[in-house]
Structure formats: structure tokens, C-alpha cells
């Protein structure tokens, strides 16, 4: 399993922990370092609400990425639509959204460095 270069915590709520799903989240988190190399930490919460314990019910994923001066938080509520396992789709979609936000943050951060100081 590829390990990211920053602290990563993957937690499961209201569902059994899945080593395969955790490894899947680790792989996606490791890819974030290719976009922005100053990530301080990342937290992933994967949960299935209490009233939806059966397989095929909605999965909620929250990805929180801490970078200098900001925290990027993305959530994905994925309802099944015939996909083999909606938890994997929700994790993938949340990390894709986090990646897009990191790209925007990196662009903004880069341009901020280019603006001359008025001091």
C-alpha cells in the first residue's frame, strides 16, 4: 500500500472497518501529494448512517486536508445506483473533489507569492 508523506487517519463510523477500503483511501491520499506538496495532514471518515445498516444504503465520506493556513473539507454522500460497492465510489469521488480544491488552492497560493508587497 503506498503511504502518503503526511499523517493520515482513516476512521469508520457505524460500519465495520474494512482493510481493503482503508487501503483504497490510502492510495487516493498518496496521490494528493502530487498536486500539493505542503499537506500537513489528512483525515478521512467513512460512515453509513445508523438507519442504513444494510448493504446498498447511502455512504457518507468526509475528507479533510490541512495545508498551511487552510483546511480543505470535502463530503460525498453516495447513494447506490447499481454500482458494485458504493463506499469505494464515495471515497473516490471525495478524493477527486479534494484534489480539485487542492489544485485551486495551489494556484491561489502560487499567485499570492507573485504579488509584490506594498510594504
Predicted regions and their residues:
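N-terminal, polar/charged subdomain of small-to-medium soluble alpha/beta proteins
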Residues: 1-119
Amino acid at each position: 500500500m503506498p503511504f502518503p508523506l503526511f499523517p493520515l487517519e482513516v476512521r469508520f463510523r457505524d460500519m465495520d472497518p474494512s482493510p481493503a477500503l482503508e487501503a483504497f483511501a490510502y492510495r487516493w491520499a498518496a496521490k494528493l501529494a502530487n498536486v500539493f506538496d505542503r499537506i500537513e495532514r489528512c483525515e478521512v471518515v467513512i460512515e453509513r448512517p445508523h438507519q442504513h445498516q444494510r448493504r446498498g444504503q447511502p455512504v457518507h465520506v468526509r475528507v479533510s486536508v490541512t495545508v498551511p493556513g487552510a483546511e480543505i473539507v470535502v463530503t460525498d454522500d453516495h447513494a447506490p445506483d447499481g454500482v458494485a460497492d458504493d463506499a469505494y465510489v464515495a471515497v473516490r469521488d471525495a478524493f477527486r473533489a479534494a484534489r480539485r480544491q487542492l489544485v485551486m488552492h495551489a494556484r491561489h497560493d502560487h499567485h499570492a507569492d507573485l504579488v509584490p508587497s506594498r510594504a
